[in-house]
């Protein structure tokens, strides 16, 4: 493990360092690099708090019409793919596991229920992700289970229940 010192917030530069494997150490939890990094900042992360008192994360992504996905999804009808918002929530659960000092490479393991009740258009200004940890297993298996919400300019539009992310020492047979 590196000499990682947990903070309560992280800048985009910090998140990119995480994507390079420099935050939690080589071979441990890391975020994807742009373009798949769906966060600009983590404004709050805590071991306590959230709806279940087991931890929470609040993060943001600034929206601009020149983001890569608007050009291809869909021509003449640009909208952010919902799967990117879902992936951002998985990214945050994995980040939380590494932030807590757990070792291993992160992998999304699924989610229970997922609902989309709105969309993210190029005219939007900001997405906010709010993750509520329900359970963190820290034994031979390292896994986080959380509920998440995505809001666009203050309106809740995506809801995910039982997001699951695990950390694995070896992903060869995954």
Curated annotation (Swiss-Prot):
Recorded catalytic activity of this chain's protein: a (3R)-hydroxyacyl-[ACP] = a (2E)-enoyl-[ACP] + H2O; (3R)-hydroxydecanoyl-[ACP] = (2E)-decenoyl-[ACP] + H2O; (2E)-decenoyl-[ACP] = (3Z)-decenoyl-[ACP]
GO MF term list: (3R)-hydroxyacyl-[acyl-carrier-protein] dehydratase activity; trans-2-decenoyl-acyl-carrier-protein isomerase activity
UniProt keywords, alphabetically: Cytoplasm, Fatty acid biosynthesis, Fatty acid metabolism, Isomerase, Lipid biosynthesis, Lipid metabolism, Lyase
Pfam family, one: FabA
Classification via InterPro entries: FabA, FabA_FabZ, HotDog_dom_sf
SUPFAM superfamilies from the UniProt entry: Thioesterase/thiol ester dehydrase-isomerase
Entry keyword annotation includes Lipid metabolism: yes
EC number: 4.2.1.59, 5.3.3.14
Pathways per UniProt: Lipid metabolism; fatty acid biosynthesis
Any single GO BP term: unsaturated fatty acid biosynthetic process
Cellular component GO terms, alphabetical: cytoplasm
Active site residues of this protein: 73
Cell compartments where the protein resides: Cytoplasm
Gene3D superfamilies in the cross-refs: Hotdog Thioesterase (3.10.129.10)
Task performed by this protein: Necessary for the introduction of cis unsaturation into fatty acids. Catalyzes the dehydration of (3R)-3-hydroxydecanoyl-ACP to E-(2)-decenoyl-ACP and then its isomerization to Z-(3)-decenoyl-ACP. Can catalyze the dehydratase reaction for beta-hydroxyacyl-ACPs with saturated chain lengths up to 16:0, being most active on intermediate chain length.
Subunit annotation: Homodimer.
Family: Belongs to the thioester dehydratase family. FabA subfamily.
HAMAP family xref list: FabA (MF_00405)
Protein name as catalogued: 3-hydroxydecanoyl-[acyl-carrier-protein] dehydratase
Native species: Cellvibrio japonicus (strain Ueda107)
């Amino acid at each position: 493990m590196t000499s990682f010192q947990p903070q309560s917030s992280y800048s985009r530069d910090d998140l990119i360092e995480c994507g390079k494997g420099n935050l939690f150490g080589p071979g441990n939890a890391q975020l994807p690099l742009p373009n798949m990094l769906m966060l600009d900042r983590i404004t709050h992360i805590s071991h306590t708090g959230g709806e279940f008192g087991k931890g929470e994360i609040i993060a943001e992504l600034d929206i601009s019409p020149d983001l890569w996905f608007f050009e291809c999804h869909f021509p003449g009808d640009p909208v952010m793919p919902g799967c990117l918002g879902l992936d951002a929530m998985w990214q945050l659960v994995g980040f939380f596991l590494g932030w807590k000092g757990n070792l291993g490479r992160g992998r999304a393991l699924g989610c229970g229920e997922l609902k989309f009740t709105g969309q993210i258009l190029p005219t939007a200004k900001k997405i906010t992700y709010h993750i509520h940890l329900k359970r963190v297993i820290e034994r031979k298996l390292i896994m986080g289970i959380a509920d998440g919400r995505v809001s666009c300019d203050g309106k809740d539009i995506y809801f995910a229940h039982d997001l699951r992310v695990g950390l694995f020492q070896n992903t060869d047979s995954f």
